[in-house]
Amino acid sequence: MGYFSLIIVITIISFLNAEGIDSQELPIGLTDFEKNNINLLLEMGRETSPPNQPVRNIAEFERMSGVLVRYPLGVSLDIIRELAEDVIVYCLVSSAQQNTALNAFNNNDINMGNIQFIVGPTDSYWTRDYGPWWVVDGNKEVGIVDFTYNRPRLNDNNAPFKTSEYLDVPYYSVDMIHCGGNYMTDGRGIGASSHLVYEENDLESENIDSLMNIYYGIDTYHVVEDPNDTYIDH
């Protein structure tokens, strides 16, 4: 897989009147059930060997060739149409809803030549939070590095692995609870998150910093108070 043959996980914004949005979607925050069963996160973790060193975590602003969304959508079909004019739209969709997604895209004049379905169940459309992060390993090979999604949503948590299987790229996972919305990197070894990453893991901060270095190539990890002071802490 070439260096630029990557996916950027776009931030999903919920528009109240956007076409194709399912009103029954799980919220970005925890539901009451999830709050009462947060211990399920401990059963979702997986760990692999880290990528060959040195590792470089690819920044979201770098050149990409595709985007990752999920159906039912969290963005309008108009946005999907615009995206599909220029890049491949990889769409996570359950087998039960694949035909519905196909019909919705066809009926809205979307370029189906740039639509690829990754089939499997998901729990929500917050792909920016649970989707894959990309690295280049010491052999200059592009792969996915995953964490345990900080919501007890097993199907969402499995999305990065399903993506790696579909694209046939290496998959690595660190047994650490995290959230894509609470992480960003400059692509040159510097990363940043809110203090939530320290609070959600039963690990010393030094251990978390070390895992970020080994799996993501982050040499300088800025963990700060949530500057927005929001309930989701990122």
Predicted regions and their residues:
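The feature marks the mature, well-folded catalytic cores of soluble enzymes
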Residues: E19-H234
